[in-house]
UniProtKB/Swiss-Prot annotation:
Entries under PANTHER family matching the protein: TRANSMEMBRANE PROTEIN 18
Topological category with respect to the lipid bilayer: Multi-pass membrane protein
InterPro entries the UniProt entry points to: TMEM18 (IPR026721)
Region (DNA-binding): 113-140
Organism whose genome encodes this protein: Homo sapiens (Human)
Residue spans, topological domain Perinuclear space: 1-25, 74-91
Protein name, UniProt field: Transmembrane protein 18
Functional summary from the UniProt entry: Transcription repressor. Sequence-specific ssDNA and dsDNA binding protein, with preference for GCT end CTG repeats. Cell migration modulator which enhances the glioma-specific migration ability of neural stem cells (NSC) and neural precursor cells (NPC).
Parts of the chain that traverse the membrane: 26-46, 53-73, 92-112
Entry GO CC: cytoplasm; nuclear membrane
Length: 140
């Protein structure tokens, strides 16, 4: 069982944070479920551009608000947690909240780049076909 955290003795390394966190706490399981649903939405939204843009913007806004969420959680941690995980440096919230959201956002950006490359390839192929058609008409 992990020891109780205090803000002054909060671990500074990622492995220490991950190993000293009590992952059985209901709010952390809820957060893990939230991240799983975000990944699912990222995968399912690949065919709906508007949904994907909205999802991406929500992810970025949540990451932007992480500092404020950390401050609120640091003041009210007794209401939902056994331990004080929320330090002033924001290490914990960065690892368990922001990092997965940023990974999701990066996946969306990679999907956009992939789609853009495919469209550019299709466009170039269409241009080549049109060019070839014109060349054949001139020969006839």
């Amino acid at each position: 069982m992990p020891s109780a955290f205090s803000v002054s003795s909060f671990p500074v390394s990622i492995p220490a944070v991950l190993t000293q966190t009590d992952w059985t706490e209901p709010w952390l399981m809820g957060l893990a479920t939230f991240h799983a649903l975000c990944v699912l939405l990222t995968c399912l939204s690949s065919r709906s551009y508007r949904l994907q843009i909205g999802h991406f913007l929500c992810l970025v806004i949540l990451v932007y608000c992480a500092e404020y969420i950390n401050e609120a959680a640091a003041m009210n941690w007794r209401l939902f947690s056994k331990y004080q995980y929320f330090d002033s440096r924001g290490m914990f919230i960065s690892i368990v909240f922001s990092a997965p959201l940023l990974v999701n956002a990066m996946i969306i950006v990679v999907m956009w780049v992939w789609k853009t490359l495919n469209v550019m390839t299709d466009l170039k192929n269409a241009q080549e076909r049109r060019k070839e058609k014109k060349r054949r008409r001139k020969e006839d």
